[in-house]
A protein has these predicted regions:
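TRNA-binding/sensing appendages of the translation machinery
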Residues: 1-67, 124
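Positively charged, Gly/Ser-enriched RNA/tRNA-binding surfaces
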Residues: 7-25, 36-37, 71-82, 89-140, ...
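Short secondary-structure junctions
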Residues: 28-32, 243-244, 341-349
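Acidic, His- and aromatic-enriched active-site or binding-groove loops in soluble protein domains
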Residues: 52-58, 160-182, 189
Length: 388
């Protein structure tokens, strides 16, 4: 009897297909408890995306936590011998705070981890599996690749204070050129140094041409070494790396990632569905000298591929609407004023109407007037195209 995969949701299909892919590449299934001793997360808090976890006192009196992360559990248990490389894949649920709802939420993940002796071949294999994981979704996808060494080497060369770095990296990730330049000046950099940091935002696009552009902007040997590693990755992958682009502004958490980082995107989903990178510092907390590389695919995000569009986005081909979520208050008023001056005013008086949705059919623009805290939720769930 042949299995009809069309009856499954995108996340269910991916789970079945990727299990075959990962096991064929030599990865073994890793199973872990839903709980870990809280001390594991307390001692490694800097490696967590959020320090908030749900804790409880178990029947034996020990303080435990509902698992917010799978990688920590694998790194703790892998313990590879010298020269050994251990390969695991997993399908697990984790529990993390949601920035949108301000509550804890369950997140379904499928991913893999490669821990131990990792060379250029092993690194290329993990990236190839990330590319094939995205390709299995059968929708347009792209994998954006970067290297933490390129960014951190520039910060070192510019003598950026350690306290200022997390904010600068956040602005790099957000591709916020204006705020990045201002924050760089505020951190003590001069105009030339601030411009050098902001220029990283232009280093994205096709792998080969972006790599060439980045070489011309290197200010130290460590940056050149990072680009050599990226060139080596491209050479190892060959034709298998066709779905890969380079984005050197893709900076991960400095406490976690120390080399290659990458994010995967699919058409129809507003944020990354796959994230991964090199995390030697975490692996070495449990196994001295070990290297580590892996990624996670966020299965919940894949369900968007089969979900019906919100009514406001069920558009015909005759007209395309731009749906904008505006916060009530002065920020929303200012943003609306700029848009109205550009010809995108609503047909009703924005400041006098009690309606929560106003629009201009001629201009093809629709505004949702929402609480500031709800702007991100409207965009996350696809009700609005952009939020301000």
């Amino acid at each position: 009897m042949q299995l009809d995969l069309s009856r499954f949701s995108p996340a269910e299909r991916s789970t079945l297909q990727l299990r075959v892919l990962y096991e064929g590449a030599g990865y073994r299934k890793f199973r872990c408890s839903h709980f870990e001793e809280y001390s594991l997360y307390q001692q490694n808090e800097r490696f967590l995306s959020d320090s908030q976890v749900i804790t409880f006192t178990d029947l034996d009196g020990k303080l435990r936590a509902i698992k917010p992360d799978v990688t920590l559990s694998i790194a703790k248990n892998a313990q590879p011998a010298a020269g050994e490389c251990k390969k695991y894949y997993y399908t697990e649920q984790i529990c993390r705070p949601s920035r949108e709802s301000h509550t804890f939420s369950e997140i379904s993940q499928m991913g893999l981890e490669c821990i131990g002796a990792i060379g250029a071949a092993e690194q290329a294999e993990v990236v190839r599996l990330a590319l094939e994981s995205l390709a299995s979704l059968e929708v347009p996808t792209v994998l954006e690749v970067s290297h933490m060494g390129f960014v951190t080497a520039l910060l070192d060369t510019l003598h950026v204070d350690a306290a200022a770095r997390p904010r600068l990296l956040e602005l790099l990730r957000d591709k916020n050129a204006h705020e990045l330049h201002a924050a760089a000046l505020q951190s003590g950099l001069d105009e030339a140094a601030a411009n050098a940091l902001t220029t990283i935002l232009s280093l994205h696009g096709p792998f080969g041409t972006t790599l060439a552009a980045a070489r011309s902007q290197c200010q130290c040997e460590a940056q050149r070494d990072a680009l050599l590693e990226l060139q080596s990755l491209q050479n190892e992958l060959g034709d298998a790396g066709r779905g890969m682009q380079l984005d050197l502004s893709l900076a991960g958490d400095m406490e976690y990632y120390n080399g290659l980082v990458f994010s995967g995107y699919v058409a129809g989903v507003p944020r990354a569905v796959l994230k991964g990178g090199r995390y030697d510092l975490l692996a070495q907390r449990f196994t001295p000298g070990a290297c580590a590389l892996g990624f996670a695919l966020y299965l919940d995000e894949l369900e968007r591929l089969s979900a019906p569009l919100p009514p406001v986005q069920q558009q015909g081909t005759e007209r395309q609407w731009l749906n904008i979520a505006l916060p009530k208050g002065r920020l929303g008023d200012k943003a609306y004023g700029l848009l109205a001056a550009a010809g995108y005013e609503a047909n009703e008086n924005y400041n006098e109407t009690r309606k929560l949705v106003v629009e201009n059919p001629e201009a093809g623009v629709r505004y949702f007037l929402v609480k500031p805290s709800d702007v991100a939720i409207y965009v996350e769930h696809g009700a609005a195209d952009i939020g301000i």
